[in-house]
């Protein structure tokens, strides 16, 4: 089942911001979406607001 996690890209490597349940060397597919762009696109009403905070709240409420 697909799982969405946040990651940061540093020095050519994607680093997850939370623990992932993977074995060392396991291959995965990554779909890149900038968090801010997703929130602004779907929730245009939030333009100019703290989109990262809004997305985290939506995830907590089970909408994402």
UniProtKB/Swiss-Prot annotation:
Pfam hit, one: AF2212-like
Keyword DNA repair appears in the UniProt entry: no
Signal sequence annotation: none
Gene3D superfamilies recorded: AF2212/PG0164-like
This protein's UniProt keywords: Toxin-antitoxin system
Keyword Signal recorded: no
Known function: Possibly the antitoxin component of a type II toxin-antitoxin (TA) system.
UniProt family annotation: Belongs to the UPF0165 family.
Name this protein carries in UniProt: Putative antitoxin AF_1074
Protein's organism: Archaeoglobus fulgidus (strain ATCC 49558 / DSM 4304 / JCM 9628 / NBRC 100126 / VC-16)
